[in-house]
Amino acid sequence: MAPPRGEGYHRVVIELADASAPPLLDVARDLFREYQLAIGVDLCFQGFERELASLPGAYAPPAGRLLVALVDGAPAGCGALRPLAGGVGELKRMWVRPAFRGRGLGRLVAEALLQAAGGQGYRAVRLDTLEPMKEARALYASMGFREIPPYYENPLPGVIYMERTCSGAAR
């Protein structure tokens, strides 16, 4: 069936781009800062400023990934994957700008990062999120992530740790 045509119809182009090199590296850095401001948490305990200054850092291929989601060429969101010990990867800095939410971009970015993790041979992927981030938690649960005990020390209240296997586990 052909896509609808007519007045008011606009085809939206969504692209996931590798942001491990300029010029998208600066876009990713800006999105990371926006993410940090939006969650309203000081991430100094994670070495956030050092992370920004050294991008792509741990998110560089082949062990990591740094993606920017573009909608009609406009930066709409981001996400990253980095290696942890023991054949485990970690999703970080998952963020979709409010104006672009509800289009499945977060899922698209997360799926691409999970695919990269599987291709890299990671046995599992972990993440941490905050209790108030209900939409993010629901997304992760729908993708097969389950709550686990803390895998690192985080001084923030209400941190939820999650993990998902990379093999062919049910989502």
Positions of predicted regions on the chain:
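Terminal substrate-recognition subdomain of acyl/acetyltransferases
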Residues: 2, 8, 158-171
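Acetyl-CoA-dependent GNAT
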Residues: 15-92, 97-98, 110-112, 116, ...
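Conserved beta-strand-loop-alpha-helix junction that forms the acyl-donor binding cleft
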Residues: 98-101, 126-136, 153-158
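Residues forming the Rossmann-fold NAD(P)(H) cofactor-binding site
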Residues: 103, 107, 111
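Conserved GNAT acetyl-CoA-binding A-motif
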Residues: 110, 117-129
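Conserved active-site tyrosine of GNAT-family acetyltransferases
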Residues: 140, 145
